[in-house]
Amino acid sequence: MERLQKVIAHAGVASRRKAEELIKEGKVKVNGKVVTELGVKVTGSDQIEVNGLKVEREEPVYFLLYKPRGVISAAQDDKGRKVVTDFFKNIPQRIYPIGRLDYDTSGLLLLTNDGEFANKLMHPKYEIDKTYVAKVKGIPPKELLRKLERGIRLEEGKTAPAKAKLLSLDKKKQTSIIQLTIHEGRNRQVRRMFEAIGHEVIKLKREEYAFLNLRGLHTGDARELTPHEVKRLRALADHGKNAF
């Protein structure tokens, strides 16, 4: 048996905290009866409704996608553009991305139907590292890379400390390849950080998420996470970097 709010969160209906609010507000029914107490536990045979809609309880699944450029990080798009879930049409579960990558950014993206798990991984307090490789205009000096590491002041505030490394440069074309590791998830953050130091991003790819990478995958490929990987991610979701 599991707590009702946990089952609702796992189904992707709402975060656990939001599920608790829905229960308190009398918007949740179990087997046709309104439940307002948070301590209620349910079994797999119990019928759950939220706001009059039946909660479909699915087996949790976890995938890693090598997202191509030109794809929306969403389960659907009202403009009819290609979305990341288009790569998973053969699975019965309704999955969605954990966080997002910009339309023009490629790289590692996780998808799941486990709402509570996704919400925890996206919470900034756990400081999960995400490593990007950017091709930028110009060749930034070491001082500008150190500025990236110390934090860049953006419109909504200063970014957290990061790690920056110059991987290669092309003096003839005046471009550089730079690796940047951050643990925040602001909108278009990496691109804006480079713009702030005067080096526009030409191409951007996320190569790592925590301990996961793209090894063995080509753009558009996906694989299911192993039980061990899921266990490690759960530890990160529960304890952040202190999990290991």
Swiss-Prot record:
Catalytic activity: uridine(2605) in 23S rRNA = pseudouridine(2605) in 23S rRNA
Gene3D superfamilies given in the database record: Alpha-L RNA-binding motif (3.30.70.1560), Pseudouridine synthase I, catalytic domain, N-terminal subdomain (3.30.70.580), RNA-binding S4 domain (3.10.290.10)
Protein name per UniProt: Ribosomal large subunit pseudouridine synthase B
Keywords, ordered alphabetically: Isomerase, RNA-binding, rRNA processing
EC number: 5.4.99.22
Alphabetized SMART domains for the sequence: S4
Pfam annotation, one family: S4
Native organism: Bacillus subtilis (strain 168)
Native organism taxonomy: Bacteria, Bacillati, Bacillota, Bacilli, Bacillales
Active site per UniProt: D102
S4 RNA-binding domain: residues covered: 2-68
